[in-house]
Amino acid sequence: MDLDEERVNMMVYAMGQAVMELSLADEPVTQAAIIDKLEQHRKETGNVIGKGVNRDAAEIVRKGKRAIKSGQ
């Protein structure tokens, strides 16, 4: 997974958006709910970069540091 600063910023934005949407909908903000929201955004976007950002953000929420290849 490429973790340049711009991509990290986009993933953090996607994660924050997911948390805000859950909070504003009075839904529980759990790891599973955030992952589901990120996957929903991935499916809804037509933008290839957006799909990748949401996929990678969901993977980091799901796996933590195991999602990042060693050596980066």
Residue ranges and their predicted role:
Residues 1-29:
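N-terminal acidic leader/helix
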Residues 10, 14, 53-54, 70:
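Generic signature of intrinsically disordered, low-complexity, basic-rich segments
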